[in-house]
Amino acid sequence: MIPTYMNIMLAFTISLLGMLTYRSHLVASLLCLEGMMMSLFIMATLMASNTHFPLINIMPIILLVFAACEAAVGLALLISISNTYGLDYIHNLNLLQC
């Protein structure tokens, strides 16, 4: 396997382990989730550049749009929780139910 792909998979794995380790705080979880999305974006970009199929070039852009939407929703949720409770613990998410 090419060392570049191994490094990207290692970055994804480290972000996944960080997500599992620091799952009690929303900020740490969002950062790890963003690291996972960025490693997936880089992997998709490398795959699209290696395969010369013209329709696959749009896939990294779609993934980047989903990552931006995920970041916006996560930050909005973080602001809502921190304004209401002053903490960023994930267990406060159950308190946001109507």
From Swiss-Prot:
Which reaction does this enzyme catalyse, per its entry?
a ubiquinone + NADH + 5 H(+)(in) = a ubiquinol + NAD(+) + 4 H(+)(out)
Q: What does this protein do?
A: Core subunit of the mitochondrial membrane respiratory chain NADH dehydrogenase (Complex I) which catalyzes electron transfer from NADH through the respiratory chain, using ubiquinone as an electron acceptor. Part of the enzyme membrane arm which is embedded in the lipid bilayer and involved in proton translocation.
Q: Which family does the UniProt entry place this protein in? A: Belongs to the complex I subunit 4L family.
Give the quaternary structure: Core subunit of respiratory chain NADH dehydrogenase (Complex I) which is composed of 45 different subunits.
Listed under GO biological process in this entry are: ATP synthesis coupled electron transport
Q: Which InterPro entries match?
A: NADH_UbQ_OxRdtase_chain4L/K (IPR001133), NUOK/Mnh_C1-like (IPR039428)
**One Gene Ontology cellular component annotation held by this UniProt entry:** respiratory chain complex I
Task: Name the EC number(s).
Answer: 7.1.1.2
Q: Which organism is it from?
A: Macaca nigrescens
What top-tier enzyme class does this entry carry? translocase
Q: Name one GO molecular function term.
A: NADH dehydrogenase (ubiquinone) activity
Q: Name one Pfam family in it.
A: Oxidored_q2
Topological relation to the membrane, as annotated: Multi-pass membrane protein
Q: What is the name of this protein?
A: NADH-ubiquinone oxidoreductase chain 4L
Q: Give the transmembrane region(s).
A: 26-46, 61-81
